[in-house]
């Protein structure tokens, strides 16, 4: 079975200066990418304008890292309509840091994903287990509960706008990385669930990204796994090695 188009997504989180990010964007713009891949850059809200203006590579799109569904009296927030009006068409939702630090439950994440899809966004929806959950043998229960909450809010046709990012929380920013076998096992579990609950056609087209201490050295071996369709990259996406990660999806 051939793989769907891969995705290499940079999650800059709350990092970067105008100078450092401008230099990185210039590097991206000058990079020759000779295969079919969708590259995504999720910057802070403050850096979105600069990124949008400066990033000219045809294989790259910009993304937001979070949003609320509606505009209104929500001081300090940014809404989906505001992002859409600004020309943002991709968004990362449900990242483990949003879940851990800002109290985003499975239900909140699912509501955000559904609202973003309904607003026409391509959504990278994040799921994954903690180290404690993995060591207690609960990886499958946790991950499938998270994706089931999202699926409950979506129609079958909506899945064309959804990308799943599996991010084992214990591997994010820790230097630990899931082995290729661990990544494949989790991705296969997710795809199998989608196949049985949503449809084999949806499962076959669904892009499932791996996120968790991905770097230029381990990306190729991870991507060779049957059900790994690309990456959601944190720390390494702020470095030139993100180009190596993109090229690992060939």
Curated annotation (Swiss-Prot):
Gene3D superfamilies, alphabetized: Aldolase class I (3.20.20.70)
Main localization of the protein described in the UniProt heading: other
SS bonds (residue pairs): none
E.C. number(s) listed in UniProt: 5.3.1.1
Pfam family, one: TIM
InterPro entries found in the cross-reference section: Aldolase_TIM, TIM_sf, TrioseP_Isoase_bac/euk, Triosephosphate_isomerase, Triosephosphate_isomerase_AS
Binding site for substrate: 11, 13
Compartment(s): Glycosome
Molecular functions per Gene Ontology: triose-phosphate isomerase activity
GO biological process, one term: glyceraldehyde-3-phosphate biosynthetic process
Extra remark: The enzyme contains a high proportion of positively-charged residues in beta-barrels V and VII (compared to the homologous regions in other triose isomerase sequences). Since 2 clusters of positive charges located at precise distances on the molecular surface are common to 4 glycosomal enzymes, it has been speculated that this might represent a signal for entry into glycosomes.
NCBIfam families tied to this protein: tim
Family membership: Belongs to the triosephosphate isomerase family.
Assembly and binders: Homodimer.
Name of the protein in question: Triosephosphate isomerase, glycosomal
Species of origin: Trypanosoma brucei brucei
């Amino acid at each position: 079975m051939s793989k769907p188009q891969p995705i290499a997504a940079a999650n800059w989180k709350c990092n970067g200066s105008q100078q450092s990010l401008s230099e990185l964007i210039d590097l991206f713009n000058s990079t020759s990418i000779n295969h079919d891949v969708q590259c995504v850059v999720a910057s802070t809200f403050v850096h979105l304008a600069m990124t949008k203006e400066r990033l000219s590579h045809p294989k790259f799109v910009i993304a937001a890292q979070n949003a609320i569904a509606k505009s209104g009296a929500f001081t300090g927030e940014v809404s989906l309509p505001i992002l859409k009006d600004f020309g943002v068409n991709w968004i990362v939702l449900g990242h483990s840091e949003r879940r851990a630090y800002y109290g985003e439950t499975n239900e909140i994440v699912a509501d955000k994903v559904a609202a973003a899809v309904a607003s026409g966004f391509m959504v990278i929806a994040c799921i994954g287990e903690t180290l404690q959950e993995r060591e207690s043998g609960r990886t499958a229960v946790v991950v499938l509960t998270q994706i089931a909450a999202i699926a409950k809010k979506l129609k079958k046709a909506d899945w064309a706008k959804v990308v799943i990012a599996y991010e084992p929380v214990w591997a994010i920013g820790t230097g630990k990385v899931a082995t290729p076998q661990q990544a494949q096992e989790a991705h296969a579990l997710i795809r199998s669930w989608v196949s049985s609950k949503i449809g084999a056609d949806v499962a076959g087209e669904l892009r499932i990204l791996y996120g968790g201490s991905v770097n230029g050295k381990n990306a190729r071996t991870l991507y060779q796994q049957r059900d790994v369709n690309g990456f959601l990259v944190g720390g390494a996406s702020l470095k030139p090695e993100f180009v190596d990660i993109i090229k690992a999806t060939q």
